[in-house]
Amino acid sequence: MSSISGLVEDEISSFFESSPPLKNKEEIVANLNQFIELNSSCQGGMRRIVCVTSGGTTVPLEQRCVRYIDNFSSGNRGAASTENFVKAGYAVIFLYRRGTCQPYCRYLPDDPFLECFEFPDAKNIQVHGSHSGAVKMAVMDQQAAVAEGRLLKLPFSTIYEYLQMLRLIATILKDVGPCSMFYLAAAVSDFYVPWLSMTEHKIESGSGPLDIRLAQVPKMLSILRSNWAPKAFCISFKLETDSKILLEKATKALQKYKVHAVVANELLTRKEEVVVVSSSGNVVVRRDSNKPESIVEDNLIRLLVDRHSTYIKESLT
């Protein structure tokens, strides 16, 4: 893997050096090391480990943040993909935006949480009959994944938290080599306000129109591929609203960042089909319309698991 340019490396270093310190860093590192050690020593040898990123990052406008710019993402794809990876035998580091969709919770009712419960008497509480099946399944699946040591959930909110945590995960996964995967489904901000240039306190609304100069977020994919975890299998995503430019931009991303595949999805059809763009050609992956419960992630993860298997075999020969 060729090294990244000095200019890009300087931009990345500058971003991290000027970022606010990551809270609970020592605890995060300890949890990651414990998780990886557990899945490295399981019966049958090393278990495959995937980092799934999910949800959108925020860009604070003040250091004591009241206002922010948001990259919206429900996190549904990341949550659904995590479930499928666990089903395929992977251990999953789920790096997710606080408040977004969680694994095993996609089929829970949209009603407010408290409406799922009822009081049969003064001393007991139980799940309402109409919701009992979904709640039971969600709790059982979630607890099984955690009890088996195959799901570690790490939350973020800001672009600063996300990128610092991604770097931590990648550098710790470096020793896992080809058995590790990155599935980068998070909606990451392209622009941000540098920490040292933003005001500390709430921006006053009475001072007239607000002009903000946004800097470009350094592209971390290049350094993830070349330095942080060069042997990991890496999948990135490209979302566009214009289908005419989608495949062209996905192909450019594939070539520029040297990832193993780019999942191209168009905003209006993203739940029905995606295109997996790779050096071996493009593959259209669709939801199985004959199965009402089917989601596109079922077939997408199945394809990527097969690709990862091939990659591991080739890496060991």
UniProtKB/Swiss-Prot annotation:
<dbReference type="InterPro" id="IPR035929">
    <property type="entry name" value="CoaB-like_sf"/>
</dbReference>
<dbReference type="InterPro" id="IPR007085">
    <property type="entry name" value="DNA/pantothenate-metab_flavo_C"/>
</dbReference>
<keyword id="KW-0173">Coenzyme A biosynthesis</keyword>
<dbReference type="GO" id="GO:0015937">
    <property type="term" value="P:coenzyme A biosynthetic process"/>
</dbReference>
<dbReference type="Pfam" id="PF04127">
    <property type="entry name" value="DFP"/>
</dbReference>
<keyword id="KW-0436">Ligase</keyword>
<comment type="pathway">
    <text>Cofactor biosynthesis; coenzyme A biosynthesis; CoA from (R)-pantothenate: step 2/5.</text>
</comment>
<comment type="similarity">
    <text>Belongs to the PPC synthetase family.</text>
</comment>
<comment type="function">
    <text>Catalyzes the first step in the biosynthesis of coenzyme A from vitamin B5/pantothenate, where cysteine is conjugated to 4'-phosphopantothenate to form 4-phosphopantothenoylcysteine. The catalytic activity is not CTP- but ATP-dependent.</text>
</comment>
<comment type="subunit">
    <text>Homodimer.</text>
</comment>
<dbReference type="GO" id="GO:0004632">
    <property type="term" value="F:phosphopantothenate--cysteine ligase activity"/>
</dbReference>
<protein>
    <recommendedName>
        <fullName>Phosphopantothenate--cysteine ligase 1</fullName>
        <ecNumber>6.3.2.51</ecNumber>
    </recommendedName>
</protein>
